[in-house]
Structure formats: C-alpha cells, structure tokens
A protein has these predicted regions:
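Acidic, metal-coordinating catalytic segment for phosphate/diphosphate chemistry
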Residues: 37-76, 80
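Short beta-strand micro-motifs in enzyme catalytic cores
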Residues: 48-52, 88, 102, 152-154, ...
Length: 214
C-alpha cells in the first residue's frame, strides 16, 4: 500500500471497521439546523469560541457555544522491520495540563492554517519524535467531541519509518519510546491508555490487520 509523495492512501470501503451497513433512508429527518446568528465570544491561539443562535431541526430556537478548531492529525507510526506480525508502535509520554496528569499517546498535533493534513502529520512526527516515513495511509477521520467542538481529527498510519532527531517546541517535554502492538493492546485491555485518539487509532489498526486489510 505504498503512497505517493503528495497523497496518503485510504483504507478501502470494504474495511470491516468502516463498512457497517447504515440505513439508506433514516427514519428521522435529515434537515439541518438553521444558523440565525453567530458571535465570537473568545479567540485564543489554538481555538475560538462562538455563541450561535440556531433553529434546531425540531423548530426549537437554541443558543449553543461552539469551539472552532482548525483540526488535528494523529500519527500511528509502526516499525515492522523486526517482527511484522507484532510491529513496534512509536509512543509518547507527556504531561497534559487539562487532564492534570501524564498520558501515554500517539504523536499528534494541530493543522496550521492553509496546511494540508498530511503535511501536518509529517511535520508533527518529525518535531515530536524525529521519525520520518516513506508510506502514509489515512486510517480514518472523526469529530473529537461533536456536541460542542467542531474539530476533525485525522489518523495517519506511517510505515517504513527511519529515526532522526526530534525538534520539540519550547513548551514540550516529550518522552518517545517503542511499544509492541500486542503490548499496546494489553495496555488498552488493562485500562492504562486514557487518551481517546490513541485508543481509536490502535483499535482501528489492530482490527484492520486482523481482517487482512493492511
């Protein structure tokens, strides 16, 4: 599944994780909410908060606070050179102030304005871990918390990796290490991984491998 230099391949539509049968004609209306007004309530370095007045599909007028974010990328970097059946995953450990604790995570970061997601993934992997990859596959993309957060997260699989020197930002102190896939899945089963993007990426990757899609 080699990718071109400009684009990452995607998992096929036959992937068992993504090809579940959905109703072709939903029983409920597909009508969207109508935006009446939108006011910028807060603008920070990473995101903005808008207070939106909307008419819901039910006809009810509602006021919603919505966080707008440029989107993020997650990198599931794997080293299959030593043991293709149980490859090594590049992991990070870092302190997260909002969570108030150290977390085990996959490398990730935000997409800068006018930056392509794949370019952001390559940049973030170099900055945080020093690794580069020859093959890139888009595993999935999803909304992080769609009730109030308009942020797409895109998970990329990076293969044929080679190690280099990381270039972390001044406020980042990241420990980088390797974990075998079997060990990572055992950590999930033991409730030791508390980061959502990492859980989604690892479980999707493991399921796709078991189904012979990767």
């Amino acid at each position: 599944m080699a990718a071109t230099s400009k684009k990452a391949k995607k998992l096929s539509a036959s992937n068992p994780v993504t090809a579940a049968k959905l109703p072709s004609k939903p029983k409920k209306s597909s009508k969207k909410a109508v935006l009446v007004s939108s006011k910028l309530s807060y603008k920070g370095k990473v995101f903005s908060v808008f207070t939106d007045t909307v008419i819901e599909p039910t006809g009810v007028t509602n006021v919603r606070d919505v966080i707008r974010h440029n989107g993020s990328v997650v990198i599931l970097a794997v080293d299959e050179s030593k043991n293709p059946k149980d490859p090594e995953i590049i992991f990070e450990r870092q302190y997260r102030h909002a969570a108030g604790q150290f977390l085990y995570e996959l490398p990730a970061g935000r997409v800068e304005p006018n930056e392509a997601p794949l370019a952001a993934a390559k940049r973030e992997m170099i900055e945080e871990t020093g690794f580069r990859a020859k093959r890139w596959t888009l595993l999935t993309k999803y909304f992080a918390s769609p009730g109030f957060l308009g942020e797409w997260m895109q998970i990329y699989l990076a293969r044929d990796i080679r190690e280099g020197t990381s270039q972390p930002e001044a406020d980042e102190e990241i420990e980088v290490f390797r974990v075998r896939l079997s060990e990572a899945m055992a950590l999930i089963a033991a409730n030791k991984i508390h980061d959502g993007k990492t859980l989604i990426g690892l479980m999707l990757y493991d399921a796709a491998r078991r189904a012979g899609k990767l």
